[in-house]
């Protein structure tokens, strides 16, 4: 549906691309303000990937409303849309659809509420995500709806450390691998933890729990609607 809409509304698609180009120009102008601001912006962009494109579902905007982050007029995005984009855009290097939600998480006698991201193994490369201990889940685990989870460092500290959520865990991440947690009343096994990336204008990935996309759709979100599609574009020089 999304791909069809883009092809059927070439003018609107062109304006959307223009909006993204203008947005990039604004970032470039902002970077030029000063050395300090430049370094901060560059570090934020590099932490998530300098060739990253984020596609979000949205609603129809009126005249004068800006276009941002590839947000379009489709009310929902689905896995079929993600696959269609991957199959039709030749410059795509990797793609990682995401289903996001907030859920109650219980472990080790601790009870908290945090962000849950259901995604695919390519998320690691698409978002420059480092693995601190254990491993990220595999395509095979995603396909069989495995109840496995990868924890950000803030989550590790909240559930298994001193609860400070400081970005520097007070517990050895390796000791968390193999532990059980409950997400929305469902048992998951921790198979890995991510390296700290810190917070930025793009948000923090330290206070997130990652689970396989199919698992999230089946057990947590109850829907096949995607929250976001992360795409990395191949560099022209490659």
Label each region the model flagged.
Residues 1-22:
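N-terminal Sec/SRP start-transfer signal
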Residues 8, 42, 50, 153, ...:
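ATP/adenylate-binding site constellation spanning eukaryotic-like Ser/Thr protein kinases
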Residues 17-19, 32, 185:
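Residue-level recognition of transmembrane alpha-helices
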Residues 22-25, 29, 33:
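Hydrophobic alpha-helical membrane-associated segments
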Residues 35-115, 119-125, 139-140, 217-218:
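Hydrophobic, regular-secondary-structure patches
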Residues 122-141, 146-238:
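Mid-to-C-terminal secondary-structure elements
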């Amino acid at each position: 549906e999304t791909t069809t809409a883009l092809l059927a509304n070439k003018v609107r698609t062109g304006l959307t691309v223009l909006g993204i180009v203008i947005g990039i120009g604004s970032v470039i102008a902002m970077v030029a303000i000063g050395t300090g601001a430049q370094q901060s912006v560059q570090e934020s962009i590099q932490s998530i990937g300098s060739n990253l494109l984020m596609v979000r579902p949205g609603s129809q905007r009126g005249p004068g409303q800006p276009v941002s982050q590839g947000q379009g007029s489709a009310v929902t995005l689905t896995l079929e849309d993600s696959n269609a984009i991957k199959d039709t855009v030749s410059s795509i290097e990797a793609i990682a659809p995401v289903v996001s939600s907030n859920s109650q998480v219980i472990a080790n006698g601790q009870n908290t509420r945090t962000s849950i991201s259901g995604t695919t193994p390519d998320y690691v490369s698409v978002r420059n995500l480092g693995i601190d201990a254990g491993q990220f889940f595999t395509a095979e685990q995603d396909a069989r709806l495995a109840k496995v989870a990868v924890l950000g460092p803030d989550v590790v500290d909240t559930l298994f450390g001193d609860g400070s959520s400081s970005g520097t865990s007070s517990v050895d991440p390796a000791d968390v691998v193999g532990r059980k947690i409950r997400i929305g009343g469902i048992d998951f096994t921790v198979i890995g933890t991510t390296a700290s990336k810190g917070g930025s204008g793009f948000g923090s990935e330290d206070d997130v729990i990652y689970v396989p996309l199919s698992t999230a759709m089946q057990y947590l979100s109850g829907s096949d609607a995607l929250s976001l599609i992360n795409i990395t574009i191949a560099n022209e020089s490659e």
